[in-house]
From Swiss-Prot:
Residues 257-338 form the Toprim domain. RNA polymerase that catalyzes the synthesis of short RNA molecules used as primers for DNA polymerase during DNA replication. It comes from the Bacteria. It comes from Treponema pallidum (strain Nichols). Monomer. Interacts with DnaB. It catalyses: ssDNA + n NTP = ssDNA/pppN(pN)n-1 hybrid + (n-1) diphosphate. PROSITE patterns: TOPRIM (PS50880). This is DNA primase. Mg(2+) 2 binds at D307, D309. One of its GO terms (molecular function) is DNA-directed RNA polymerase activity.
Amino acid sequence: MARISAHVIDAIADRVDLVSLVGNYTHLERRGDDWWGRCPFHHERTPSFHVVPDKKMYYCFGCGVGGSTIKFFMEIEKIDFHEAAVRLAKRAGIEMSFEDGVHAPSAHASFTMQLCEVYQRIAETFHHVLMHTAQGARARAYLASRKVTDDSIRTFKLGYAPPDPVWLFQFLRHKGYSPEFLARSGLFAKKSERIAVFSDRIMYPIADRYGQVIAFGARALGTAPAKYLNTADMPQYKKGEHLFAFHCALSQMRKTRAAIICEGYMDVIAFHQAQLTYAVAPLGALLTKSQARLMRSFVDRIYMCFDADGAGRAATYKAILLCRSLGFEVRIVELNGGTDPAECACIEGEDALRKSVERSTTDAQYLIRCARHEHSHLGADDTSRAVSFLFPYLSVLDSAIQREQVMQDIAMAFGIRIQAVHADYLRYVSRTTQKGTTGNCVLSVQGTAIQVKEPATGVRTAQLRLVLAVVANPELFELLRESVCADDFEDPMAKELFIILEECYRADTRASPHVLSCCTTDELRKLVSEAIVCGEFSCNAPQIVRDGVALVRRNRLLKERESLVGRLRRFGDASSGEECGSMQELMMEKQRVDEELERLKGVRK
């Protein structure tokens, strides 16, 4: 693959605002010249993720991840360097160029970008059909009957797929898309590649956090066998990693530090029309860990509003455990008569939705009520079974005080002593611990979610510290290179880093992003990121480098002296004139080394 030219990497670093980019994934707050937030790569309560705009670098003191603008985008989007650079350059309006003048993107990257393009195009086309054509009249009437406003149709880019199942194939062929590409696009039936998956349906575009359409949900208007259809997982879309309307809700999520999670597209729209514009929906039956973590950096409180039927209660229970394990506060929104939010808004008005959120209950109150409902169908001897329903919830609470309070509420609700609840809970914990597993899939999430890794920066030798000081202060590299060379370094990472700095110096690309892009291991990248961001070498760097250079030179001279002494010993008592001459040369060389070592002592003092 062609190597991206250095000036493009420089342009990305200069023109892509790292604070804004990171801000799409976690909430940042300014402290002095830098920005801090919760790390988007691991679960944490106290912000330890540090962004330094003037150095165009980030670093997490909790898990040790760090790097440049391109590195962040690579890691957060799970793509390679080439694709990350191309996508960032496109977003910033930077013309791509390559060292050999040839751009050869990977087949996967090219296919993914083409998929995003075609999904965005047809979302706009479906929206036009809905809003401005006679074919869309029936769909407009349906949405009006559900009290969906024109403003909401525009906000969510709702559309209508015409009833002719061949129309979309012909439309896209006319736009220049090949039959081979369309067959792989996820838009057409596998057994009949001209037949559209979506026809005669209300279309709900699913977008990523930037508003780029990547998939569709669809509701049939006619008598189709499947009332609802959704895009299958594709290279650009994994349903368990996205939330419907996340890009629309993100701004208000940041302001309120809250999110409403409901079940369906129409439920989300109903909440937004009620000015509760921080509502989103999972794209499946259950909220996933990836979806919950998507909100974690922006949200402290989750309002859950799932259906009141058995499946809805089960989904609520699992979502509570998951969100609690990730540190969210959770409240439950319950609607009158067991209606869903869209029905509630239609029947009782938008104010009813707002009031339902205001009177939401805690997750503990909700679960205790569910347990008591279960107890009402059991015999008196089965109270323990109903109470044990709550033990997984107790396990995901990270506060002992909170856990004790919930135990008191359980005891009061069931008319039993708190000591009995506590004893049964301890037995439950003991059993799950002995098995080496929690016995509950969501409890196992807890162990992963709250684990915070120590930075894997390893032990830093004096040589490595010297080179890291130069990495953090690249203007000092000339001072380093005029005194030492790569072979003077015994530490392998220090040697590798010196070689990288030398290559960047010769290419006149000593900026941090270039140094990072040349690092061959994650450990070295973490060391470099930490050195640049942490500020350890921001004070007295020239003296650190001078002392380090003196130490490297001293080690080199000591090795040279040891070699000379060994050679002198081998001469023994020189007899011939030639041997005497050679021995004299070695002694003079040793004297020179000794004098140099004495001078270095003076420098170090």
